[in-house]
């Protein structure tokens, strides 16, 4: 008696569905919690953007951590500048008040005991041997002479650089760009110093004064970066072998920085290797002629607009996908925004015909009334 054959073929259960590369970038809507898909995507991202090696001597600094550090340093520096400006203004006001009081006293007494006597000229002080030739009058002539010589000095004054054009004072980190000089002039992070990796090969003075000042200093760190960790990892390993203990490498370099913070942190035009490519199958928009690459500015501090952009990208990056505990916060924020939107829409006319309601809402309400359907 032959064995009983089952209906269907068991191979159908193991057969894979062919994937269309055109829709490879489309993700499913329902993707919550930890899954194998997310784990594989994370591994692929690490292989693509990072170059982890075993037994790394240096420490790594995430791009998001660096952005938070930049925001804190900029806010503290602005507060310090405001306090310093207030103190300088107060001292200037005190000096002007004292000088006005001295001028009034001198005008009343003419520099002597009686207000009626006329003050002799400086020439009389020096040449005459009369009553005006006293210790006080001679001192006054010297003072007036110095003042006459300093009249022309006030016209020619060297323009002092603005405080905002200089690096942050007492900055806790020293940012070094280890690419070549041309790449640095094309694009770099705001506040970074150019330190090509070839400088480490010098036999005499391979380090600048800033690097020696920050080397193993308490409360200060040195950060190296490049485009894709190729040069920065070599430079960081060499410097750690030479005794640098407070050295960090910006994990991912400019490539990851451009993905997470397209604006705000960088000045100049990003290289082509760091720019994001459009996914396969996506519609490319027609653009005009390509704009020429703008060189990087000599910029040492972040503007308020830059800091706003950095904060926006930080909030966007720190979503519920990274931290599940933030899911409830985002839901509550979404509810608050909906409530605010509803309050804002109270001014609109309330009488809406029933025909304007979408069929989706009607069917959803119908199903809520009958859960078994």
From Swiss-Prot:
<keyword id="KW-0653">Protein transport</keyword>
<dbReference type="GO" id="GO:0018095">
    <property type="term" value="P:protein polyglutamylation"/>
</dbReference>
<feature type="region of interest" description="Disordered">
    <location>
        <begin position="317"/>
        <end position="373"/>
    </location>
</feature>
<dbReference type="InterPro" id="IPR001763">
    <property type="entry name" value="Rhodanese-like_dom"/>
</dbReference>
<comment type="subunit">
    <text>Found in a complex with TTLL6.</text>
</comment>
<keyword id="KW-0966">Cell projection</keyword>
<dbReference type="GO" id="GO:0005814">
    <property type="term" value="C:centriole"/>
</dbReference>
<comment type="similarity">
    <text>Belongs to the CEP41 family.</text>
</comment>
<feature type="modified residue" description="Omega-N-methylarginine">
    <location>
        <position position="343"/>
    </location>
</feature>
<keyword id="KW-0597">Phosphoprotein</keyword>
<dbReference type="GO" id="GO:0060271">
    <property type="term" value="P:cilium assembly"/>
</dbReference>
<dbReference type="GO" id="GO:0005737">
    <property type="term" value="C:cytoplasm"/>
</dbReference>
<keyword id="KW-0488">Methylation</keyword>
<feature type="modified residue" description="Phosphoserine">
    <location>
        <position position="121"/>
    </location>
</feature>
<feature type="modified residue" description="Phosphothreonine">
    <location>
        <position position="109"/>
    </location>
</feature>
<keyword id="KW-0206">Cytoskeleton</keyword>
<keyword id="KW-0813">Transport</keyword>
<dbReference type="GO" id="GO:0036064">
    <property type="term" value="C:ciliary basal body"/>
</dbReference>
<comment type="function">
    <text>Required during ciliogenesis for tubulin glutamylation in cilium. Probably acts by participating in the transport of TTLL6, a tubulin polyglutamylase, between the basal body and the cilium.</text>
</comment>
<feature type="compositionally biased region" description="Polar residues">
    <location>
        <begin position="116"/>
        <end position="137"/>
    </location>
</feature>
<keyword id="KW-0969">Cilium</keyword>
<dbReference type="Pfam" id="PF00581">
    <property type="entry name" value="Rhodanese"/>
</dbReference>
<feature type="region of interest" description="Disordered">
    <location>
        <begin position="91"/>
        <end position="137"/>
    </location>
</feature>
<keyword id="KW-1186">Ciliopathy</keyword>
<dbReference type="InterPro" id="IPR051889">
    <property type="entry name" value="CEP41"/>
</dbReference>
<feature type="domain" description="Rhodanese">
    <location>
        <begin position="169"/>
        <end position="266"/>
    </location>
</feature>
<feature type="compositionally biased region" description="Polar residues">
    <location>
        <begin position="347"/>
        <end position="366"/>
    </location>
</feature>
<keyword id="KW-0970">Cilium biogenesis/degradation</keyword>
<dbReference type="InterPro" id="IPR036873">
    <property type="entry name" value="Rhodanese-like_dom_sf"/>
</dbReference>
<feature type="modified residue" description="Phosphoserine">
    <location>
        <position position="96"/>
    </location>
</feature>
<feature type="modified residue" description="Phosphoserine">
    <location>
        <position position="99"/>
    </location>
</feature>
<feature type="compositionally biased region" description="Polar residues">
    <location>
        <begin position="325"/>
        <end position="334"/>
    </location>
</feature>
<feature type="modified residue" description="Phosphoserine">
    <location>
        <position position="114"/>
    </location>
</feature>
<dbReference type="GO" id="GO:0015031">
    <property type="term" value="P:protein transport"/>
</dbReference>
<protein>
    <recommendedName>
        <fullName>Centrosomal protein of 41 kDa</fullName>
    </recommendedName>
</protein>
<dbReference type="GO" id="GO:0005813">
    <property type="term" value="C:centrosome"/>
</dbReference>
<dbReference type="GO" id="GO:0005929">
    <property type="term" value="C:cilium"/>
</dbReference>
<keyword id="KW-0963">Cytoplasm</keyword>
């Amino acid at each position: 008696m032959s064995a009983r054959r089952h209906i269907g073929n068991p191979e159908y259960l193991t057969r894979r569905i062919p994937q269309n590369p055109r829709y490879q970038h489309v993700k499913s809507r329902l993707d919550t919690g930890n899954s194998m898909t997310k784990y594989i995507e994370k591994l692929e991202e690490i292989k693509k953007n990072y170059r982890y090696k075993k037994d790394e001597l240096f420490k790594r600094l995430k791009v998001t951590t660096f952005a938070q550090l930049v925001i804190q340093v900029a806010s503290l520096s602005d507060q310090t500048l405001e306090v310093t400006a207030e103190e300088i203004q107060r001292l200037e006001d005190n000096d002007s008040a004292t000088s006005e009081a001295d001028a009034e006293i001198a005008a009343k007494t003419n520099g002597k005991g009686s207000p009626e006597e006329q003050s002799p000229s400086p020439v009389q002080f020096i040449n005459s041997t009369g009553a005006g030739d006293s210790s006080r009058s001679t001192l006054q002539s010297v003072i007036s002479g110095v003042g006459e010589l300093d009249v022309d000095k006030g016209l020619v004054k060297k323009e002092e650089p603005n405080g905002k054009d200089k690096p942050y004072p007492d900055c806790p980190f020293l940012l070094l760009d280890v690419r070549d000089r041309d790449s640095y002039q094309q694009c770099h992070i705001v506040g970074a110093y150019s330190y090509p990796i070839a400088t480490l090969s010098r036999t005499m003075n391979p380090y600048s004064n800033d690097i020696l000042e920050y080397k193993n200093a308490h409360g200060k760190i040195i950060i190296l970066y490049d485009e894709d960790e190729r040069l920065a990892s070599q430079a960081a390993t060499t410097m750690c072998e030479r005794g640098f203990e407070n050295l960090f490498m910006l994990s991912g370099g400019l490539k990851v920085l451009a993905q997470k913070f397209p604006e705000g942190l960088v000045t100049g035009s990003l290289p082509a290797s760091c720019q994001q490519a459009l996914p396969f199958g996506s519609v490319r928009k027609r653009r005009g002629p390509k704009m020429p690459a703008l060189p990087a500015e000599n910029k040492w501090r972040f503007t308020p607009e830059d800091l706003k952009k950095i904060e926006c990208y930080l909030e966007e990056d720190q979503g519920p996908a990274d931290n599940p505990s933030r899911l409830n916060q985002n839901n509550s924020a979404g509810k608050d925004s909906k409530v605010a939107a509803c309050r804002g829409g109270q001014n609109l006319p309330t009488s809406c015909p029933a025909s304007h309601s979408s069929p989706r809402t009607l069917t959803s309400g119908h199903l809520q009334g009958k859960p078994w359907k």
